[in-house]
Design a protein with these regions (language model features):
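Extracellular beta-strand-rich solenoid/capping regions of secreted or surface-exposed proteins
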Residues: 23-25
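Single, function-defining residue in the core of a domain
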Residues: 1-2, 6-17, 27-268
Length: 268
């Protein structure tokens, strides 16, 4: 319940239809809508409409989304490698915002001290090292901000580097918590595949924002339905919701026609 995930998603729209949007492909007709979301308790907590060309960078867009979001002190912010600025990590630490992310392997840093690694047998990840470091920014400038760098290797042999400012949790806990970031990717998939979050009924910014808010309200109601009925997965929950809605509509038709709605339960 403490995990607050942040990520952005893109929607491609023809530049002939769209006045507002980011040019990410270098062509005037290649415009995209970029939205930065916050997700907590499986429910969208915030959405930010990116309008400036500079916000094509996650170091700007996603950081602004985090800064504008309503965060609790105990929240743990989860985001991917889109945010890579050492200064951003320093600012989050100074603002006492807990975060867990990944960084590119072989990122330049200065070692401050090494933490002891307690191995857990039969784990999906092998922890290679657990270190307190200072990262380097561009032009090899060291940023004086102690962060924790956890190096791990998965079963496929790929090396993963996790970065956090949380010092009291074990390295395995940090890696395990980061997996929960994937929940926002599942949410994006649900929006685009099942709620048709691929098309807009309006192509100006105000109209698109109204549409997005309506869509998110529908998504929140659907998540509440899923949790209330103790259903796992969006696909199964959507099927169950569709069947229940269909039955309710048929009952209304039967009542309107003067029939017995109880017979609907016997036949469906």
């Amino acid at each position: 319940n403490k995990f607050h995930r942040f990520d952005s998603t893109l929607i491609n729209i023809s530049g002939k239809l769209l006045k507002d949007g980011l040019n990410l492909g270098g062509k005037t007709d290649d415009k995209q809508i970029k939205l930065s979301f916050g997700l907590k308790h499986s429910i969208p907590s915030s959405v930010r409409f990116c309008t400036e060309q500079a916000e094509s960078s996650e170091d700007i867009a996603l950081v602004r989304a985090i800064n504008e979001a309503k965060l609790e002190k105990e929240d743990i912010i989860l985001f991917d490698r889109g945010i890579a600025s050492a200064n951003t990590f320093k600012n989050l630490t100074q603002e006492e915002k807990q975060f867990i992310t990944r960084i590119n392997v072989n990122r330049c840093y200065e070692l401050v001290k090494t933490k002891e690694v307690i191995l857990i047998p039969n784990s999906d990840l092998e922890i290679i090292s657990d270190e307190i470091v200072n990262l380097y920014a561009r032009k090899k400038k060291k940023i004086n901000n102690n962060v924790r760098l956890i190096k791990a290797r998965n079963k496929q042999g790929d090396e993963l580097w996790f970065l956090t400012n949380i010092m009291h949790l074990s390295s395995y806990d940090i890696a395990s918590i980061y997996k929960r970031r994937w929940d926002i990717e599942v949410f994006f998939k649900f929006l685009k595949q099942h709620l048709q979050f691929k098309h807009f009924i309006s192509y100006n910014q105000n109209g698109m924002q109204v549409y997005i808010y309506c869509l998110l309200i529908a998504a929140i109601l659907f998540v509440i339905f899923k949790i209330t009925n103790k259903l796992s997965g969006f696909k199964i929950a959507l099927l169950q919701f569709t069947l229940m809605l269909e039955k309710a509509i048929i009952k209304d038709i039967v009542i309107f026609s003067g029939g017995n709605p109880e017979l609907v339960e016997l036949r469906l």
